[in-house]
A protein has these predicted regions:
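N-terminal Rossmann-like NAD(P)+-binding domain of SDR-like oxidoreductases, especially those catalyzing
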Residues: 1-161
Length: 161
């Protein structure tokens, strides 16, 4: 059996050096780790998030706000700002990690959760569909998108959503 670390050794991480990388949701748990990693790889990292959202411990402890190339503060439901920002940056790579991910909050405010998670993702897809430059888009979600069937192990890509 091949271990994932063997795949990592074969991957070409030099692709990110001097590239413009936009992370939407860069101040969250996964986004701040990704931003720090890409900065170490010498990428020019841009970030979009809302300042009213709590910053992750990683974001705070690594002083990401001082190391990132540029941060933008707005809600991903704002299509015009998202479109303008992406067309201004012209990123080589876009990582979409923004979401309202708190399960308890989603039960208390399902409409806002739906708008952020679904409309936000639709906005990024539509903007990228209509740009006139090449970019690479990676949308990252959570295991909460899978049907909760009480599995003891992790989910597989073939599991029901």
């Amino acid at each position: 059996m091949v271990k994932s670390s063997q795949y990592l050794r074969k991957m070409n991480f030099k692709n990110y050096k001097n590239k413009k990388v936009l992370i939407i949701g860069h101040s969250g748990f996964k986004g701040s780790w990704l931003a720090n990693w890409l900065i170490e790889l010498k990428a020019k990292v841009y970030g979009i998030s809302k300042k009213s959202i709590n910053r992750s411990q990683t974001y705070v402890s690594t002083k990401l706000n001082k190391r990132i190339f540029k941060e933008y503060d707005f809600d991903i439901r704002n299509y015009k700002k998202l479109n303008r920002t992406i067309n201004q940056i012209k990123p080589d790579y876009i990582f979409f990690l923004a979401a309202q991910s708190l399960v308890g909050k989603s039960y208390k405010d399902p409409v806002t959760t739906w708008q952020i998670n679904f409309v936000g993702a639709l906005n990024i897809l539509d903007v990228v569909k209509n740009i006139n430059f090449k970019t690479n888009l990676v949308l990252i979600t959570s295991d909460k998108c899978y049907e909760n069937i009480g599995k003891k192990s992790g989910y597989k890509e073939t599991d029901l959503l």
